[in-house]
């Protein structure tokens, strides 16, 4: 479908992938800073630097990019989620030890901004499962996801101003678009942390759960999304992102063309027939 070409093809060939089966979970190894698990149709990527509060080093960033590419390229994966290990932090930001000597050339590299863009442009739905601190670059990774789910103990901030810099991973552009200009400016300029309740109120997150319910909720959402016709979530993503960056009239026109394209699919016929016959649809992505 031409209108789905809005998403760039960032997938690549990944080698040295080894599968390990354990209690229904498939674990893809060969990573040092992250974990990659398949749970049904869900690809769960876990930042695993607990002693560093899951701070995102350059090597961690490289692995995250690889993991997203693996999930995007895997036909068995329908939903992608990112979380943090340890129960105290999603990601406390970039690894500051690597920021100290960062020069202009390095500052202009995509770094976290590139990962967030990759998550945003991946046709498959992406979730950020947040438990604990979600700060700086960690928040910017979460902002690149389609949905953000958090536990009650989670806190959010863009504290870069206290370090004499500004966010460089996309927060100045994405945060105001997600929470509005007022709260976007509040969080960016003040740099103060907000709690999960406030994050829910302003739309930074859309679901708030107890800590022991975070993974079950992510799995439940993934199962729900996996039951949809494959073209639906990817087209919905394309429409929303295009609509946010275009005129209302242009977005409405493209929506009509997108609807027209989906109406011609076999999945549309299956969906309507299943509804009329009061049965569960069997979508094939055709």
Task: Report the location of each language-model feature.
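C-terminal alpha-helix plus adjacent terminal tail
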Residues: 21-40, 74-75, 87, 191-197, ...
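Conserved CoA-thioester-binding segment of acyl-CoA-metabolizing enzymes
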Residues: 14, 26-83, 117
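Crotonase-fold acyl-CoA enzyme core
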Residues: 117-233, 257, 261-265, 270-273, ...
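Glycine- (often His-adjacent) and acidic-residue-rich active-site loop
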Residues: 69, 84-118, 134, 162, ...
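Aromatic (phenylalanine/tyrosine) cluster motif
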Residues: 6-7, 22
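Terminal peptide-recognition signature
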Residues: 45, 49, 64, 82, ...
């Amino acid at each position: 479908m031409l209108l789905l070409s809005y998403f760039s093809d960032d997938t690549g060939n990944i080698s040295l992938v080894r599968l390990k089966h354990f209690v229904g979970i498939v674990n893809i190894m060969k990573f040092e800073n992250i974990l990659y698990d398949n749970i049904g149709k869900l690809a769960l990527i876990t930042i695993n630097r607990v002693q560093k509060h899951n701070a995102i080093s350059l090597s961690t960033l490289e692995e995250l990019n690889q993991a997203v590419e693996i999930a995007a390229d895997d036909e068995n994966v329908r939903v992608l989620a990112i979380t943090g290990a340890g129960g105290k932090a999603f990601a406390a930001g970039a690894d500051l030890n690597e920021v100290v000597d960062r020069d202009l050339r390095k500052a202009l590299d995509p770094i976290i901004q590139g990962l967030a863009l990759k998550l945003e442009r991946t046709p498959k739905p992406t979730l950020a499962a947040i438990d604990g601190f979600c700060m700086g670059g960690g928040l910017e990774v979460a902002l690149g996801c389609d949905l953000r789910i958090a536990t009650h103990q989670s806190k959010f901030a863009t504290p870069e101003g206290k370090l004499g810099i500004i966010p460089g991973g996309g927060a100045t552009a994405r945060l105001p678009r997600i929470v509005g200009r007022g709260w976007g400016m509040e969080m960016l300029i003040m740099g103060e942390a907000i709690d999960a309740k406030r994050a829910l109120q302003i739309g930074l997150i859309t679901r708030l759960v107890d800590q022991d319910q975070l993974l079950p909720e992510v799995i439940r959402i993934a199962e729900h999304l996996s039951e949809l016709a494959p073209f639906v979530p990817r087209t919905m993503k394309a429409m929303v992102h295009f609509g946010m960056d275009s005129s209302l009239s242009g977005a409405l026109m493209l929506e009509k063309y997108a609807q027209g394209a989906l109406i011609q699919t076999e999945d549309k016929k299956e969906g309507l027939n299943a509804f009329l016959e009061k049965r569960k649809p069997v979508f094939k992505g055709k």
